[in-house]
From Swiss-Prot:
GO terms for cellular component: cytoplasm. This is Phenylalanine--tRNA ligase alpha subunit. It is found in: Cytoplasm. The gene is pheS. Its cofactor is Mg(2+). One of its GO terms (biological process) is phenylalanyl-tRNA aminoacylation. The keyword Metal-binding applies. It catalyses: tRNA(Phe) + L-phenylalanine + ATP = L-phenylalanyl-tRNA(Phe) + AMP + diphosphate + H(+). Keywords: Aminoacyl-tRNA synthetase, ATP-binding, Cytoplasm, Ligase, Magnesium, Metal-binding, Nucleotide-binding, Protein biosynthesis. GO terms for molecular function: ATP binding; magnesium ion binding; phenylalanine-tRNA ligase activity; tRNA binding. It is an enzyme of class 6 (ligase). CDD domains: PheRS_alpha_core. Belongs to the class-II aminoacyl-tRNA synthetase family. Phe-tRNA synthetase alpha subunit type 1 subfamily. Its main location: cytoplasm.
C-alpha cells in the first residue's frame, strides 16, 4: 500500500482547509464514508497472502484513526470559533442597570381592612375572628333574630342543613366574645360573609367589619363620636355626616350613617346602634349594669367610596390593569 500515506496526507490537508462543519462533514464522507478512499483500502486486503492481511489491516486502521482524530480536532476548533463569534455578538454591557423588579401590592380591600384596623387599634380595640361556617344560634338566635325573621329566608342565606349555614354577618363573633369575656369589651371583627345575591353592588361573598363596645355607662353619644372620628380619618376630609333612624333586631335604638358625597348626595356607609338588651341577656351580661354599642360596615363598599370604584365586581375579577392602580 505505497499510496496510503499519501491518502492520509491529503485527508489531513482537506480537514484543515474545511472552513465550517458542513465542509468538514464532506471530507469525512470522502475519506471515511462507506465508499470513502480509506474505507476502500480494506477491499485490497484480499489480494494479499493470508499471513500479511493482519499487518496490512492494522496499518489501514491506523491511517483511518489518524484522519478521524484530525476530523475531531478540527470540528472542536470550528465549534469553538462559532461559539466565540456568537458570544462576541451577544456581549452584555455589565454597566447597564438590571431589570426593575416588579413589586406586588396589597389588594384595595385589604388596604381598607388594614387602615380600619389601625385606626381602631389606636383606640384600644382588639381584632377578633370566628368561623365562617356558623350555626343558627350564633348567627341569628343570640342576635335577637327569631326563626320567622326575613333574614333567615332561603334566598338570603346559604344553608347547609337546618342549623348550619355560611355566616351572613360577622356579628356571631361578637356573641362568642361576650360569652367568653366579661366587660369591658372593645373589639372589631373583620371577615368574609356570604349572602345569596349578585349584581353591580352585591356579590355572594364580601368582607364586613363589625365593631363592639360593652362597658358601664356607654351611650349613643359615645357611638356618634367614635364613628365621626373614624369616618373623617378614613376619608381624610371633614365630611358632613348624618345618622338616620333605622331598624336592626340586635340594636335599639338603631341608625344608618350617611356621608355627603362630592355630587351633593347622601351615601350610606354603615349601620349601627346600641346593643339590644336581649342580646346582652343571651350572653349572660346584665343590661341594667352594662350597655354597649355596635356597628357594621361593608369593606368593599367603603373601598368603592374611597377610591371612586363604581362596580363592586371589579374587586374579584383579578384584572391587573385595575389592581395595579392601588399599588
Amino acid at each position: 500500500m505505497p499510496h496510503l500515506a499519501e491518502l492520509v496526507a491529503k485527508a489531513k490537508a482537506a480537514v484543515e482547509d474545511a472552513q465550517d462543519i458542513a465542509a468538514l462533514d464532506l471530507v469525512r464522507v470522502e475519506y471515511l464514508g462507506k465508499k470513502g478512499h480509506l474505507t476502500l483500502q480494506m477491499t485490497s486486503l484480499r489480494e494479499l497472502p493470508a499471513e500479511e492481511r493482519p499487518a496490512a489491516g492494522a496499518v489501514i486502521n491506523q491511517a483511518k484513526q489518524e484522519v478521524q482524530e484530525a476530523l475531531n480536532a478540527r470540528k472542536e476548533k470550528l465549534e469553538s470559533a462559532v461559539l466565540n463569534a456568537r458570544l462576541a455578538a451577544e456581549t452584555i454591557d455589565v454597566s447597564l442597570p438590571g431589570r426593575r423588579m416588579e413589586n406586588g401590592g396589597l389588594h384595595p380591600v385589604t388596604r381598607t381592612i388594614e387602615r380600619i384596623e389601625t385606626f381602631f387599634g389606636e383606640l384600644g380595640f382588639s381584632v377578633e375572628s370566628g368561623p365562617e361556617i356558623e350555626d343558627d344560634y350564633h348567627n341569628f338566635d343570640a342576635l335577637n333574630i327569631p326563626a320567622h325573621h326575613p333574614a333567615r329566608a332561603d334566598h338570603d342565606t346559604f344553608w347547609f342543613d337546618a342549623t348550619r349555614l355560611l355566616r351572613t354577618q360577622t356579628s356571631g363573633v361578637q356573641i362568642r366574645t361576650m360569652q367568653e369575656q366579661q366587660p369591658p369589651i372593645r373589639i372589631i371583627v373583620p371577615g368574609r360573609v356570604y349572602r345569596n345575591d349578585y349584581d353591580q353592588t352585591h356579590t355572594p361573598m364580601f368582607h364586613q367589619m363589625e365593631g363592639l363596645i360593652v362597658d358601664r355607662d356607654i351611650s349613643f353619644t359615645n357611638l356618634k363620636g367614635t364613628l365621626h372620628d373614624f369616618l373623617r380619618n378614613f376619608f381624610e376630609e371633614d365630611l358632613q355626616i348624618r345618622f338616620r333612624p333605622s331598624y336592626f333586631p340586635f340594636t335599639e335604638p338603631s341608625a344608618e350613617v350617611d356621608v355627603m358625597g362630592k355630587n351633593g348626595k347622601w351615601l350610606e356607609v354603615l349601620g349601627c346602634g346600641m346593643v339590644h338588651p336581649n342580646v346582652l341577656r343571651n350572653v349572660g351580661i346584665d343590661p341594667e349594669i352594662y350597655s354597649g354599642f355596635a356597628f357594621g360596615m361593608g369593606m368593599e363598599r367603603l373601598t368603592m367610596l374611597r377610591y371612586g370604584v363604581t362596580d363592586l365586581r371589579a374587586f374579584f375579577e383579578n384584572d391587573l390593569r385595575f389592581l395595579k392602580q392601588f399599588k
